[in-house]
Amino acid sequence: MSGCPFLGKSFGYAFKPLSAQGSEEDKSQAGVNRASKGGLIYGNYLQLEKVLNAQELQSEMKGNKIHDEHLFIITHQAYELWFKQILWELDSVREIFQNGHVRDERNMLKVITRMHRVVVILKLLVQQFSVLETMTALDFNDFREYLSPASGFQSLQFRLLENKIGVLQSLRVPYNRRHYRDNFRGKDNELLLKSEQERTLLQLVEAWLERTPGLEPHGFNFWGKLEKNIVKGLEEEFTKIQAKEESEEKEEQMAEFQKQKEVLLSLFDEKRHEHLLSKGERRLSYKALQGALMIYFYREEPRFQVPFQLLTFLMDVDSLMTKWRYNHVCLVHRMLGSKAGTGGSSGYQYLRSTVSDRYKVFVDLFNLSTYLVPRHWIPKMNPVIHKFLYTAEYCDSSYFSSDESD
């Protein structure tokens, strides 16, 4: 056999023999140790001396060192660090909305990237409870007496997070019949008050949704066309059911139809919406709800794909905050049973009352599924409007955002 011609000597290839220890070891040692020349090093950059020495066991200070208190402190400090990062991301998103940079749709990538990061962090925080669950109730009881009157309710950052997202003060469950801010003093109280006065993420998103292209009555007029199509569709549905022979099945279908009709037509009752808004059962303005539903229906259009992702991430934040509360409730129930909390609250009973839609901020986005209709009921677009939804709006002067939001 002549063998492979490409390996022949006639081609002039000369292969070096392979070594067992080879050149890989040499390459792995080819770098330069820059740290030996001085300058910033890892520990100094992260200020690890402060971070790693910030665990003071109260049990040890009282002369009775309890092993699991260290885990308890580390876990809660990790929570607070992640809360700080969430607030950092949330503030940057709010600033983009606040300064009008979101009018340039190219900035929406920043918004959804940072909101996605918030979602991923919250997923981590929900899972982190499993670490605390490695501690038994008896283990916790060994050092619990040293914690009072400290309480998780006193987490300033978590309360700031609630306020900045948009939890309504009127819907908060009172803490021992007192306003939640009464548990904070001095600068902390001032920060909470300031966060209540600032525009929330909910309010900023609401204003953004109200500007959804296609809502203009003298333009595409999505809302007017949707109402017309739904009324027509309901009439056709009624005619189909009415034409059937009398039977128990027909009665059931007619009853279901009446329910569907009431729900869908209520969508166009602005006074009813305002009434539900005043009761806290709805959070978005009537026009913002229209914008959200339009994005929901036309989410496959290029211009609405990114806005739809944002609405999805906002719902994820709400869901994960609820899961976090629920996991917290379960952990407290496991550790304390029905005993009072270290801060003096009713413990499990109080926490359980916070796992509800009262603390959901973007509840209207979840409820959009209530108004799903057959695709052929959704208003069709003419070529001009369809082309319009392929074109993003941008403004060079607003594209360059401030340093803080970069």
Curated annotation (Swiss-Prot):
PANTHER family named among the record's database cross-references: TRYPTOPHAN 2,3-DIOXYGENASE
Entry binding sites for substrate: 72-76, 144, 342
GO biological process: L-tryptophan catabolic process to acetyl-CoA; L-tryptophan catabolic process to kynurenine; protein homotetramerization
Enzyme Commission code(s) on record: 1.13.11.11
Protein name: Tryptophan 2,3-dioxygenase
Family, similarity comment: Belongs to the tryptophan 2,3-dioxygenase family.
Modified residues (Phosphoserine): 19
Role description: Heme-dependent dioxygenase that catalyzes the oxidative cleavage of the L-tryptophan (L-Trp) pyrrole ring and converts L-tryptophan to N-formyl-L-kynurenine. Catalyzes the oxidative cleavage of the indole moiety.
Keyword Iron: yes
Single GO MF descriptor: metal ion binding
The organism of origin for this protein: Bos taurus (Bovine)
Sites where the protein binds heme: 328
UniProt gene name: TDO2
Assembly mode: Homotetramer. Dimer of dimers.
Cofactor note: Binds 1 heme group per subunit.
Cofactor(s) listed: heme
S-S bonds: none
EC category name: oxidoreductase
